[in-house]
């Protein structure tokens, strides 16, 4: 039977608001694809992201551009060259993996030859606010032992220090989303070098020609600067020593698997990350948890509501998806 591609959109309200250096969000628009293939229906979700010049309309249009190939039975392998590494390809790639798992009667982790995924501690994100408010939120989030702090400028250092005082049991990820300059980064590293900081995520704009001292603590993690495996040698030479792999950036589970595997082999600390989205967007990455040193899949926790049959979150941990959700 010929496949049928169905494209839908959904808007998820944020629990409160989600503020990072470049924007404040109250609603998260996502694009979901379904591939109908006789007895099977598979799914994938992506998040159009303004930072990469994506909108719901542009992503939908790009997915539509390969409708005939999808409905004619394109393989996961051929999809990699049919679309660039981006959100559109992510949704389709994940749906094709889900379809193969259903048809083969095997979980995606088995198809990849990986260890069975297990429940993992996930980082929990605190969006930008005053130091007192962020410290209070950190105390409220006592079940989460790893906290990701969004900062928008050098004043965010005060919030970091306030949270370290309020939650001495926690380890932190500092995420500046490209908001600092080199002098400010040096100040942040000097202030935090003796504290339990896993890494500082994308402190400088991704397109700045710069290098980091890999011996300086905390180490630097690439987020906006990382998209595909081809970026890894350059990032290593620049002094990045950690990578945040997101399926919406790299173009799906196929490339996410290669990124985590190759990055780990090169010596990077690896993080399985996400855009804010539903459990359907998190589920594919949970299949790769054995390749990740750090899990940052808290997207559904930041929403007012999640998709049906979503991931289980409890006591700071996230569990792998049930087959009714994905994979």
Describe the residue ranges of each PLM region.
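Catalytic core of soluble alpha/beta enzymes
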Residues: 149, 154-290, 304-316
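Short helix/strand-capping turn motifs
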Residues: 293-296
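Active-site cofactor/co-catalyst pockets and adjacent glycine-rich loops in catalytic enzymes
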Residues: 300
């Amino acid at each position: 039977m010929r496949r049928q591609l169905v494209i839908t959109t959904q808007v998820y309200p944020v629990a409160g608001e989600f503020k990072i250096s470049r924007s404040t969000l109250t609603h998260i628009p996502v694009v979901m694809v379904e591939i109908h293939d006789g007895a099977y229906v598979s799914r994938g979700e992506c998040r159009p992201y303004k930072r990469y010049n994506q909108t719901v309309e542009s992503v939908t249009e790009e997915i539509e551009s390969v409708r005939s190939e999808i409905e004619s039975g394109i393989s996961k392998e051929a999809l990699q060259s049919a679309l660039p590494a981006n959100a559109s390809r992510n949704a389709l790639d994940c749906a094709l993996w889900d379809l193969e798992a259903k048809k083969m009667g095997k979980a995606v982790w088995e198809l990849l030859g990986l260890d069975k995924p297990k429940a993992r501690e996930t980082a929990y994100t605190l969006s930008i606010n005053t130091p007192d408010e962020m410290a209070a939120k950190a105390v409220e989030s006592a079940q989460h032992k790893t906290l990701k702090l969004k900062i928008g400028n050098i004043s965010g250092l005060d919030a970091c220090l306030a949270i370290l005082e309020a939650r001495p049991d926690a380890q932190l990820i500092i995420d500046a989303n490209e908001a600092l300059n080199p002098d400010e980064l040096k100040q942040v590293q000097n202030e935090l070098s003796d504290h339990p900081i896993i890494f500082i995520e994308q402190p400088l704009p991704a397109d700045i020609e710069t290098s980091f001292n890999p011996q300086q603590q905390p180490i630097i993690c690439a987020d906006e600067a990382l998209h595909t495996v081809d970026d890894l040698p350059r990032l290593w030479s620049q002094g990045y020593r950690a990578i945040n792999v997101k399926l919406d950036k790299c173009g799906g589970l196929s490339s996410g698997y290669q990124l985590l595997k190759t990055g780990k082999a090169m010596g990077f600390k690896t993080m399985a990350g996400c855009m804010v989205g539903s459990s359907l967007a998190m589920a594919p990455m949970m299949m790769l948890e054995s390749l990740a040193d750090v899990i940052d899949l808290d997207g559904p926790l930041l929403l007012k509501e999640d998709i049906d049959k979503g991931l289980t979150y409890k006591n700071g941990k996230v569990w792998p998806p049930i087959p009714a959700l994905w994979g």
